């Protein structure tokens, strides 16, 4: 009878690679291009909206120990310190979409050049439960939201 089990040799552990936000964005786009048409990039997301970087290791040159987060609705990608932004984008985007289905006007603060979303109007009409901690803006591109206040100069 053996008291001790023989240890299995462990696979050599690879060192984590450091990647930039731009590298992750390029890797996600390349992943989506390489996949079959019916497989969207949101399949890379975990329940907490972090990106499963192990599935991007062939595009990144290894597995990163960093965390990046993506909005399910706008596909914007963020670093860990901005992990609250994708959730806000998704909640408010759903509220804006529902609002636009029932109203002809835009839920933006009147007079703002960058079309800042009017949270009070969305809350008052029961499309949003609470105000996000950051301002969001309604773009002209399919009425998608962004967190960038200067989005108007980037679309042209």
Q: Model segments located where?
A:
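Short acidic linear motifs
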Residues: 1-156
């Amino acid at each position: 009878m053996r008291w001790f089990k023989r240890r299995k040799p462990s696979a050599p552990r690879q060192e984590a690679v450091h990647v930039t936000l731009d590298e992750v964005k390029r890797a996600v786009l390349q992943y989506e291009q390489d996949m079959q048409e019916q497989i969207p990039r949101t399949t890379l997301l975990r329940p907490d909206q972090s990106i499963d970087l192990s599935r991007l290791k062939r595009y990144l040159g290894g597995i990163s120990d960093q965390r990046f987060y993506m909005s399910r609705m706008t596909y914007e990608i963020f670093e860990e310190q901005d992990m609250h932004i994708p959730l806000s984008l998704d909640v408010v985007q759903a509220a804006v979409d529902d609002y636009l289905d029932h109203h002809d006007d835009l839920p933006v603060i009147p007079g703002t050049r960058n079309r800042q979303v009017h949270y009070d109007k969305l809350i008052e009409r029961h499309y949003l439960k609470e105000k996000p901690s950051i301002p969001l803006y309604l773009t002209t591109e399919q009425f998608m939201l962004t967190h960038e206040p200067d989005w108007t100069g980037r679309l042209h």
